[in-house]
Amino acid sequence: MKVAVLGAAGGIGQALSLLLKTQLPAGSELSLYDVAPVVPGVAVDLSHIPTDVKVTGFGKDDLASALVGSDIVLIPAGVPRKPGMDRSDLFNMNAGIVKNLVQGVADNCPNACVGIITNPVNTTVPIAAEVLKKAGCYDKRKLFGVTTLDVIRSEAFVGELRGLNPENVNVPVIGGHSGTTILPLLSQVEGVEFTEQEIKDLTHRIQNAGTEVVEAKAGGGSATLSMGQAAARFALSLLKGLQGQDTIECTYVEGPGDNAKFFAQPVRLGKNGAEEILSYGKLSAFEQKCMDEMLDGLKGDIQTGIDFAS
């Protein structure tokens, strides 16, 4: 299997690449691309880690070489959040980056599964879909918005609150990947009861966790390490699926459109990518209210992406 990371020299890209170098199955190839001149050095640095994963770095003129033969393409490229910015402020800078990189995917590895990490994911995934449609190679089973960070944060925060091992906590997170569009289904956490206030506080913390990190880093970065871990978890689950070992992850995909054209919910990953979009079950009254209040915003984010790509 060949995995390409586009934007591999950034904070997320380096963390993700390190995790993939240490966790991809033996015999895998890891292809690192970035416009930053440091990327060949990142590849050399990682090549000194003794795992049977071949790492190659590609500079800004070598996108085609980086992509050819890729099974999975992960795109964390773009400008990170700074204090005072929200994910939508990133749109003007990052939309064009995603559009160009996905065009590269269409030209060089049109059958690859693509995981979009670049924010705002609510909008960049629809942009990617439109680019792939125009190129005649769009398969909705193979395009994903990586929302796993919301899931791992939910698991960590629930574990912290209840003194549980977070590795044993499972929290489905549905909707989108910014602000109130992030909807953790805390009513579905097995074996744990929350008060109404705890649910409100936890939901708010999960929705604003990115800001918590940006402010804590005081201008020195955004959530790069946790996002790297989240992206690696998603990529490794997807890889297992492609190899015939079905896995389930929450991810932002084009679905039946019951709520919005693109929507994050549990998905069964298999040999063709998104094999089946699973039901997220019954919502509590609080969750349903949150859903009703956020859908218009999510639909607006999606339309912004479609309009940009057109």
Curated annotation (Swiss-Prot):
GO biological process terms, alphabetically, are:
malate metabolic process; tricarboxylic acid cycle
Q: State the function annotated in the UniProt record.
A: Catalyzes the reversible oxidation of malate to oxaloacetate.
Instruction: Give the Enzyme Commission number.
Output: 1.1.1.37
Task: Locate the transmembrane regions by residue number.
Answer: none
Protein name as it appears in the record: Malate dehydrogenase
UniProt record similarity statement = Belongs to the LDH/MDH superfamily. MDH type 1 family.
Where along this sequence does the record place binding of substrate?
81, 87, 119, 153
Q: Where is the active site?
A: 177
Residues that hold NAD(+) according to the record:
7-13, 34, 94, 117-119, 227
- Cite the entry's keywords alphabetically: NAD, Oxidoreductase, Tricarboxylic acid cycle
Task: Return the broad EC class.
Answer: oxidoreductase
Q: Name one GO molecular function term.
A: L-malate dehydrogenase (NAD+) activity
**Which organism is the protein's source?**
Idiomarina loihiensis (strain ATCC BAA-735 / DSM 15497 / L2-TR)
